[in-house]
Amino acid sequence: MRHPDVVIIMTDEERNAPPYEGDDLKAWREEALPARHWFQQNGVSFERHYTGSLACVPSRPTLFTGHFPDLHGVTQTDGLGKDASDSRMRWLRPGEVPTIGHWFKAAGYDTHYDGKWHITHADLINPDSGLPIPTNTENGEVIEENVKAYLEANPLEEFGFSGWVGPEPHGAGLANSGFIRDNLIAERIVKWLKDRYLRRESGDAEALRPFLLVASFVNPHDIVLFPGWRRQENNPIKKSDLDPPKVPEPPTRHEDLSSKPAAQIAYKNAYFSGYGPHNRVKKIYERNEQAYRDLYYRLHLEVDGPIDSVRKTVSGNTLNETILFRTSDHGDLLGAHGGLHQKWFTLYDEATRVPFQIVRTGRNPSQPRTILDIPTSHVDLIPTALGMAGLEEKELSLKLSDSFTEVHPLPGCDLSPLIENQNKTHFLERSVYMMTRDNMLEGDNLASALARHLGRANNPPAPMKIRVPADVASNFEGIVKRVSDTDAQGGKGNLWKLVRAFDDPSTWSHPGVRQLTSSSPPAIRHRNSTIPDQWELYNLDSDPIELENESKNPALGEVFNFLKNCLKEESANQVPERNNPWPYARRKPPKEQIPVKKPPPPARFLRNFLQKIGLHPEDLHPFEDELNDFRALIVCTNHSWLDVAKPTGVFSSEMTVPYYLFTDAGIEVDLASPLGGEIAIDPMSLRAVTRSHHDDRFLVDDLLKEKVRKSISMSDIDVEIYDVIYFAGGWGASFD
């Protein structure tokens, strides 16, 4: 049996048309976007398709591994709040969860990927500059030598693909914008396809193998560049006869969000700080809303040509059967729901509902149909692609389990029966699960894009510091499901969405200990208490714009409780436990941002003198590695008075130096004492002249102060659980 070729065409940030899109925009889509129109006219369109996760980085491995973030591990997006090396970033790890590339490679396919990847940090780095190696200029001129370097390095090989040419089209530079890169991506792919088809015609055995091709385009993602592109002189996109009509504001633009989870209003009040001075950036958006919405739709036009050139090359080849998928990684809120932007801290349809279309070409072409009533998910891609290609999931799973540690049954559905217009009863009853833990603005340095651009990342001035969404939970999960009156009174056979906003200490900035809960002036704040769950409930048939949160409507109590149980079941069924846990790393602020109590200038001078003669010498070889899976115990004294009636205790630096050396390396540290409770600290050791810089940290560190007040009794300690036990000195220790 000859297996068909499989082609996946992706865009970035393209939402499905919302229900409030008017007739003029629908007409514009048909006229100006021929690539999308071709898929509509030749394939099966799933109008209720959901991403599975948000945002960019978590969504892509959800699509390409067929699993949710709690299994594949990728939960955070770099960009505004984090750079690629941020301690809180979690890129897909090799050798754990196989990608669709691995699945098809195991079946004998060639697997080729070109365009935006954004699942691992795959850029080649120039060792001299420390910057990604470019493959094109801002004018779109190709740097052939660097393209060759990427092809030779083959950075995606361990993730199941070849052919990728970086760097990621990500960031503010024009050279990495979709405006420049999408055409270059399309040109490379068309060249690759034409060569492949030509070699097949000549009987080349290697070329005759079926292939999986991913063509991953950027736009309409350039909408994130709007603050810089709002002025016409800075915008590379020129007016066109095919410009979209004026895009009206969404009907939820002015809702006050008072009935929604608190994270949404907190995110609204924090988002702009990711770019730069909050109030200034906010004004740019609010004064240019029409231009903002119009640009988003115009960017659909920019990428339609590159999509169509790939599509025409594939559909023009009549010798082979090909299955084409078209989708996007996520959508965009575009000012809906009270003025929310992008796709974080919500599961609204504008952010989670995206195009999903399947076309089969060849001897048995697909018949055009639109499926309106069945919810589908990104996790359905791999089962559907395998099913339509005639490949056995169980057989391939056994083969992959020899090479990967996290091979689990795929949670998605094979949608191929729907392509064949077979019985859809089973699909009508399904629940579609989705989740996100993407706390995008929370990173190590809390530096806005402008601060980083100006070289102020480690110590940004207050106006250029990111404000994290304050005092809210940052995890969301939800389901979309049809509920009958038999299931729950009030369901009415309608399609419902239930969303839970929840806190999870395992994901805190200091996991299990405390969470960064505010970074607004005058000081950073943490919390160590868990925020209660908050809920959203929407009837998607009667309220498709998700305006009325029905979670507290007593008339819908049965529907709410029924869906709560369904959500709990789906979460357990759809997200299996990892074989090898991957705990979250602790946030690591730069040294410049670590709070300290500075001594006054005279004391500072005397401290420097004492350091030169040997007190608290500087560590000339600081430890730089990570020891995240280790635990340490520091044992101190309870004895606070000498027999001669002088106060005593542990000399502070004997405790603070090992404590901060351990914690800065990622080690979890407990404090213990013979009796438990208050640890005695020699007051002389905390005087401005005699204390160390570690003591300066202690004096403003509420967490360590709490540990000092509530040390663990040695009688309650199991020493076997610790990798290091350190006995802190001090006169009082001799009395214990």
Locations of regions flagged by a protein language model:
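Substrate-binding rim/cap in mid-to-C-terminal beta-strand-loop elements of soluble/periplasmic
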Residues: F64, S162-A175, D308, K343-T425, ...
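Short, structured active-site-proximal loop/turn typified by the sulfatase FGly-forming signature C/S-X-P-X-R
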Residues: Y20-R60, G66-L71, D110-T111, F560, ...
